[in-house]
Amino acid sequence: MAQKINKWRHTHMSEKQFMLLLSVPTGFLAGLSAIIIKKLAHYIRDYFYNIATHDDHYGLLFFILPAIGILLTIIFCRYFLKRDVGHGIPGILYAIQKNKGAVKPYNTFASIITSSLTVGFGGSVGLEGPSVSTGSAIGSNIGQLLRLNQKNIVVLIGMGCAAALASIFQAPITGIIFAIEVFMIDISMASLIPII
């Protein structure tokens, strides 16, 4: 499939146009993943803390619930995922520097589940890192699926990062600046336009 798409692309559009075209599904999927992370974490939090506020041991549950969230995250990683989720933004930076931008496919969904459980049960972590990691993993995997070169994969990582941050903070300029500052090695108009 990737060969057919690449063959069609080479005959019908330039590389810049193709990257601009890829910005739509990459941005949509990365933004959607950030919304899913946020909504799922808030749903879990609202559900369990609503139960906790109606319990006689109200204060004790606020210590127990985060431990349950961490335990569920460990169980998911150990028995279902059977590997470490990764290290968020540093993991993406490592993939850019050492793996030609290749992020493992499981990173597109693992942080959605683990961060939603941890934060939803009251763990003291934020949703920004997992959102950036998931959005970047989506961009990387789209690039790998289409067998793009490292430069274009890094641009797709930047697209995913910017879209995820823009979605979770509802601040698109912040997402763009963060993606350029943290992930983009080569800043040119050809790589900047699709991120915007």
Model-derived segments and spans:
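Alpha-helical transmembrane segments and immediately membrane-proximal extracytoplasmic
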Residues: M1-I196
